[in-house]
Each structure stands twice: as C-alpha cells, then as structure tokens.
Amino acid sequence: MATVDLEKLRMSGAGKAIGVLTSGGDAQGMNAAVRAVTRMGIYVGAKVFLIYEGYEGLVEGGENIKPANWLSVSNIIQLGGTIIGSARCKAFTTREGRLAAAYNLLQHGITNLCVIGGDGSLTGANIFRNEWGSLLEELVKEGKISESTAQNYAHLSIAGLVGSIDNDFCGTDMTIGTDSALHRIMEVIDAITTTAQSHQRTFVLEVMGRHCGYLALVSALASGADWLFIPEAPPEDGWENFMCERLGETRSRGSRLNIIIIAEGAIDRHGKPISSSYVKDLVVQRLGFDTRVTVLGHVQRGGTPSAFDRVLSSKMGMEAVMALLEATPDTPACVVSLSGNQSVRLPLMECVQVTKDVQKAMDEKRFDEAIQLRGRSFENNWKIYKLLAHQKVSKEKSNFSLAILNVGAPAAGMNAAVRSAVRTGISEGHTVYVVHDGFEGLAKGQVQEVGWHDVAGWLGRGGSMLGTKRTLPKPHLEAIVENLRTYNIHALLVIGGFEAYEGVLQLVEARGRYEELCIVMCVIPATISNNVPGTDFSLGSDTAVNAAMESCDRIKQSASGTKRRVFIVETMGGYCGYLATVTGIAVGADAAYVFEDPFNIHDLKANVEHMTEKMKTDIQRGLVLRNEKCHEHYTTEFLYNLYSSEGRGVFDCRTNVLGHLQQGGAPTPFDRNYGTKLGVKAMLWMSEKLRDVYRKGRVFANAPDSACVIGLRKKVVAFSSVTELKKETDFEHRMPREQWWLNLRLMLKMLAHYRISMADYVSGELEHVTRRTLSIDKGF
C-alpha cells in the first residue's frame, strides 16, 4: 500500500484537468461517485469538468462540458440515477465521433477522463485512449489545433468505475448499483409474499441482469425461493418434472406460497431461452396452482441508493482521482475495483477480457467454467444456493444434539441465521433445539426441539423470533450446566452481539469446573454496533446503517427546506463508532464524532467555525453525527448548546436521537444473505468438529479451537478461537482494539471539505486479474 505525502498530494493535481462522465444504463450510486471524483479532484488542486449526457455530450461538446465547483455536487448523494445524464452513443463508436470528442476535450485542456459505466463504456474509453496520439495528429493536419497543443496534451489517462446494476464485470466483487437493485428486488418480494400467502399462489418473478444471473441468484438466496433459473447454470434436461415435483412437495409440507425467480437471460442446456410465461403455463398445466408472473423491469434501476452503494461509490471515486494523478504514459487504463473491503486498481482490458471469456464459455456450453470466471463471490453464492436448495430432512440420525440461541440486543439477520443453521443441522441428521430468551432461557429450561417447517418464512423477518436477552451466563452457570445435561446438548450456536462473545468466553473459562461445558461452541456476531472481535462485519450492522441513513436523509431534507439549520444526530453503537462513521459518509455529514478518533475543544471550535463559513455559501444546512458514547463530557446536549450559542445569528440548531429505529425493519439483502451463509458455514463447521472430538460414545472438546467466532475477515470467512481473540479485545469499552474502518474517516472529512493531514491516505495498488484471484476456496 502506498502512503501519500500530504503537501505533495494537496498540489499534485495543480495544472491538471479531469473530466467525469456517466455512460450506458444508469445505476444508483453514480451520483455519489460523481460527487467523490469532483470533490477529490478539487481537493488536490485540479480543475474538474462535468460532461453531460455521457459520450454523446463528449462528441457534441459546447454546453455539455461544464466546469464544476465544490457546490455543483452538493446534496446529490441520496439521489438515484445520474444528475449529469447518461446516453448510449452511436457516434462515439465511429472514428469521426472520437475525433470530435478529442477536439472538445482539448478545448478545455482535459487529459484525464473518469468514466462511470458498464463494460461497453469502459472498452470505448480504452479505444479512445489508444487512438489519442493519432487523433491529435489528424487534428493538427486539419489545422484545428497547433503542434504545441498536441505536444502539451500528448497523453490521455483513463480511470474507470463500474456502474451497472447487473454486477457482470469481472475483477470487482460488487459494481455500483448492484446492492441498491437488490434492495428494490427484496422490497418487491416482501410485498408479493404477503399477497401470495393470502391466496396460496405461486409467483414467477423475472429480474434484470442481461446475460448475468447475479441479481437472480442473490435474491433467490435472500428470499428462500423454491426454484431459480440463471444463464450461467442452465437446468438439466427434464427439469420441468423436477421443478413441479419440488413445488408440489413444499405445498404438501404446509407452505402457502411458491416463489420462482428467473433471470431475464435464462436458457436451457441447449441455449434455448426459458421465458417466465413458459414457466407459468407449465405450473398451471401440471399442478393447477394459481400462478402469476411479475416482471420487475426498470423498478430495479430506480430509487435511492443503499448505504453500501453510497460508500462504495465515494471510496471508488476518490481512488479513481488518485489513479489519474499517479498515471504515466506507460500505465495501462485502469478500473477501480472492490476486493473484500479494500479498493484496488486493475488493468481495464484484463477485466474486459475475462468478462468476454465468461460469455464465450457460456456460448460454448462450458457452464462450470463460466461460474468460476464470474468470480469468488458468485461461485460461493452458487455453492450455498445449491446446498440449501437440495437440503432434505436426513433419513439417518446422528448421535448429536445442538442448541441455538440469540444473545444481546435484536439485530436484523438473526432469524436468517437461525433458519439456515436449523435446516443445515437437520439435513446433517442432528437433533436441533432452539432456546428462547438467551442464556437466561437456557438456565430456565426454555428449550424446544425444532423441525424443518418451524423456521419457514423466517428469512425476511427483522428482530429476533427466538427472543433475546443481554444476560451473561456466569450468574446462572449451575442451571445452564444442568439443562445442557438434561437435553444432552453437544454443541451451542450463539447468535448475538458482544454479550454472545463474552458469554461463550465465560463458558469456556468454566470448562475446568464443569465437564458438560466441554462441548463445541460457535458465535455468529450479530449486532448493529459492529463491535465484536473476529469479524469485519457483524450481522445487522448493514440494516442499521441503512435505517440511520434513511432517517438522516429526511432530516437533511427538513434542514434544506428550513435554511440555515444544523441538525445534531445521535446514533447508537455503544463506544464503537462504526455506525456514526459509515452513516456519516452515506449521508454526506459535516462531521461524525466517535470515541476511537479522540477530539478536544479545539476540534469542536474548528467544526463550528467550518459550519459558520459553510452557511455563507449556497448550502445553508448542516448535519453532525455523534456516537452515543463518543465522549463522557461532550454529550449531545453539550454539542447542541455549543453549536446554538456559537452559531447565534448565523444558524439555528436542532437535535435528534435516532434510538431503536436503527435496529431496522426488514433485514437488507446483505444481512439476509450474510446470515444465511454464516448459519450454514457455522453448522457445517460444528458438525465436523463434533465428529473430530467424538470418542467412545461421548463428546469431549476442550481445545481452544473448539469455541470460535465465525466472521468475514477481508476476503475470507474465518473461524477465530475466543480465547485467542481475548488479546484483541478492549473489554472496558466492549470492542476490538483494532478497527479496520478507521481509514474511512479520512474520506468523510475530505468530502466534507476539511483541510486535514492526508499522510494516512492509503491508495490502492495496481493488481492483475488472474483466474487464481477470481476463485478462492473460502470466502463469499
């Protein structure tokens, strides 16, 4: 990772001009990317131009290319679509069109282009870059530009950001707009589920994605669909019989609805398209079910961007500017990608080539290879989907009994994790119990055996269906041990927040006294605070950030209407500032005070002065976030009083404590999927461990690795022993000692126009696309 020197960076853009355009189909989050590129460009001293209507505007020039200032991109982060317009342009595909485009760029001295669009748009940009030299020669010949102009602007640098709801671009885990499109799909599925259940209907849902099945695959996983059609994995011949058999089976088990998800590019083994109407007619003829088709269409492109898309676009936009500043005539055109939770740069044409290879593999019916080329994330989603879709109640019983409980505060995604863990456990042949009300319930014996159908419909439910308490096990150890013995429990799956982790640690530490605690234990971190060690993301934190973000969007709208108003908003999270920081980036907050980033009265003074200066511009509103425990003395009330008195006559101030709103309603697609995957992986890991420690008819597990936290770390799902994690934990403040997201705070401050030290800015390295990086065994 390259660390950038502040003063050099501050002026590194001096004399450079950057043009930014959006091209191809629109995607939610493009505005956040335009905002980040514009502001980062201005931050480093470059001139930034907005190019309206995509390549069409580039070819036509004139009023379509306008200089941007800091305020040009204010208050756009929450808007869907793209404010600078997008178009699919025929003219740019011709040499004449590109000649006109080159001339228009030279009129403004632009030799750096940031293109936000799909693979077609990015390929076009690369052709433009390769031809740049010959285009200039032609312009000199025609007498349109001078020799000296051609020499001064001899090289064109390109940085691409992939904006496409389809997530069909190889080399990046997620493209801009994909997460928001999934939000729209899940909103529709949730709405359809209620009507389908009322009438016992079957719904065939057609989702977008051209020749890529990502949206269909992930929404099928997140909704627990009965059947799925995607172009990368066409069904075997005779699928009609299998599908009808499956649908009939689920109905006979008591299910009141069936959901079939079909990608718009779905085909059979022979490359023949499978249409939603064909599937509907099939179900009606064979099974006589009341069946309806819903084609989601352009709804998926619309609406406000999700928190993930806003943060992703902001991070990628800033990285694109860094890539343009560091580009030389010899560096290839690059595309900024997401790998795990890091941004990296990849050579544009390598990515385009692999993207084309996928299509070629599908055309040549090499479907397994197509799935592999789609990347690590796609392949793992497909494996988990297949596993869940083919799970059945096991005919053979194992000797093991497992119990599942929720501990801590409710968090979205808990029910998804319980559902997939229960079903995986049952399909492995285990006896599965659920415990109501956490460790307290375990002490009181609130334990019941659970069956396959008992968890139907849990996937999209928010909160905790089992009931959850914050009580730790220490005071109730005798009773807990008694019940573990009574029910003969060999493994515990604890889904919850910091209390879940601390509780399992207490049980492990009591193993010396009670042999019954020498069992396999696993913690699935689920808390809105994202403060459990051993994972980068806790279940429920994505839903919480989205809930806080929606509230802040409304608050910002109120402030915009009132003029000269500053809102101070308090978020939850205990001592952990994750919620405040990420929400702050997603809503374009002016500041976010958190415990991990210590601040004093001088910082507060600087913030108030910054706000006063801001009120003199056209943006007459302010939004300040404060984590609930960021400072023992500088409380929300203190900040309100400070801003009110210092801003007297310039702005007025209001406070808002978001409170339990942040626990969210229905879980976001990310939390549904993440919960489902963690439930499956945790249960499979526990099954394997149980087989390892089963000796002479009994389970005895006392090694450190028999009690773990499962979590996503960078790119892989890892199991970390709770005793090992003890060293990494700050128990007083209930959080990990190291926080990966602290580097995001720099982004928040820069986009809010603070002149801060950038010695800590970490820019992504140029990596290469290889088949190896595309499929890692573990991970998501």
Swiss-Prot record:
Biological process terms in GO annotation: canonical glycolysis; fructose 1,6-bisphosphate metabolic process; fructose 6-phosphate metabolic process; glycolytic process; glycolytic process through fructose-6-phosphate; negative regulation of insulin secretion; response to glucose
Residues annotated for ATP binding in this entry: G25, R88, C89, G118, D119, G120, S121
Active site: D166 (proton acceptor)
Glycan-linked positions: S529
Pfam family of the protein (one): PFK
Presence of keyword Transport: no
Pathway: Carbohydrate degradation; glycolysis; D-glyceraldehyde 3-phosphate and glycerone phosphate from D-glucose: step 3/4
Co-factor requirement: Mg(2+)
N-terminal catalytic PFK domain 1 as annotated region, ranges: 2-390
PTM field: GlcNAcylation at Ser-529 by OGT decreases enzyme activity, leading to redirect glucose flux through the oxidative pentose phosphate pathway. Glycosylation is stimulated by both hypoxia and glucose deprivation.
Residue positions binding Mg(2+): D119
Any GO MF annotation of the entry: kinase binding
Modified positions (Phosphoserine) in chain numbering: S377, S775
Start and end residues of each stretch annotated as Interdomain linker: 391-400
Family to which the UniProt record says this protein belongs: Belongs to the phosphofructokinase type A (PFKA) family. ATP-dependent PFK group I subfamily. Eukaryotic two domain clade 'E' sub-subfamily.
Designated name of the protein: ATP-dependent 6-phosphofructokinase, liver type
Lineage: Eukaryota, Metazoa, Chordata, Craniata, Vertebrata
Gene: Pfkl
